[in-house]
């Protein structure tokens, strides 16, 4: 392990932190990086590389949990009335989050082996990037024609279920969990900020659970000589994700989804040109 390896870990953590919660697909970007960098440089064994991805994803998840710490405490009954909506009697509930989680959890369980075997390639990521961009452009167009629910505390169970169904699209690498779910929320009548809030809150339990299970499963690959590599990636992913989530939430109602859609289309077309 040398200083260059640590720099690589930091760069990969930055990629994860930048893309995990922006609607551009962190999985897609990590597959691309894995294909054109990790595999070609042979920095890690395949098993250690997969464990590293889990570690940096955990860093980005903990960052969003930190951003929403007051909301999490509120959901657990440990903090009261953190928004004006809650003071008037409206409140996002754990039940709504559970309703949103069920569809993707069921489909992911049923088709996990198929997804792992057939959908994790640069070509499928390119398809997901472009298809997700089309969905995002459609969501912004629909959003211009209707009034929106501007607070996550006012969303309905129907909207929560609908966003959960849209989240199923993210099982295809490249679609993006946040891109699919925020687009779905906007189509269903939420403001961009309210849809983003629910998307991030809903992601915390399922991604935290999946990451911890994967980490336990791959614990043997956390060897002492790789520990500096893993720690560097974890810290960089946490710090970058912290800034990205806060920045994204401040701006999403103003910039909408179009800039992200344009980026996805350009990247998807570039991947088709380079890898087809």
Curated annotation (Swiss-Prot):
Annotated localization: Cell membrane
GO biological process, one term: peptidoglycan biosynthetic process
This protein's UniProt keywords: Antibiotic resistance, Cell membrane, Cell shape, Cell wall biogenesis/degradation, Hydrolase, Membrane, Peptidoglycan synthesis, Transmembrane, Transmembrane helix
GO cellular component terms given for this protein: plasma membrane
Keyword Transferase on entry: no
Family matches, as Pfam families: BacA
Statement: the UniProt record of this protein carries the keyword Cell membrane: yes
InterPro entries reported for this sequence: UppP
Single GO term (MF): undecaprenyl-diphosphatase activity
Entry EC no(s): 3.6.1.27
Transmembrane segments: 3-23, 48-68, 92-112, 119-139, 196-216, 225-245, 255-275
Topology in membrane: Multi-pass membrane protein
Catalyzed reactions: di-trans,octa-cis-undecaprenyl diphosphate + H2O = di-trans,octa-cis-undecaprenyl phosphate + phosphate + H(+)
Assigned protein family: Belongs to the UppP family.
Miscellaneous comment in the UniProt entry for this protein: Bacitracin is thought to be involved in the inhibition of peptidoglycan synthesis by sequestering undecaprenyl diphosphate, thereby reducing the pool of lipid carrier available.
Functional note: Catalyzes the dephosphorylation of undecaprenyl diphosphate (UPP). Confers resistance to bacitracin.
Entries under HAMAP family matching the protein: Undec_diphosphatase
Name under which the protein is recorded: Undecaprenyl-diphosphatase 2
Organism in which the protein naturally occurs: Bacillus licheniformis (strain ATCC 14580 / DSM 13 / JCM 2505 / CCUG 7422 / NBRC 12200 / NCIMB 9375 / NCTC 10341 / NRRL NRS-1264 / Gibson 46)
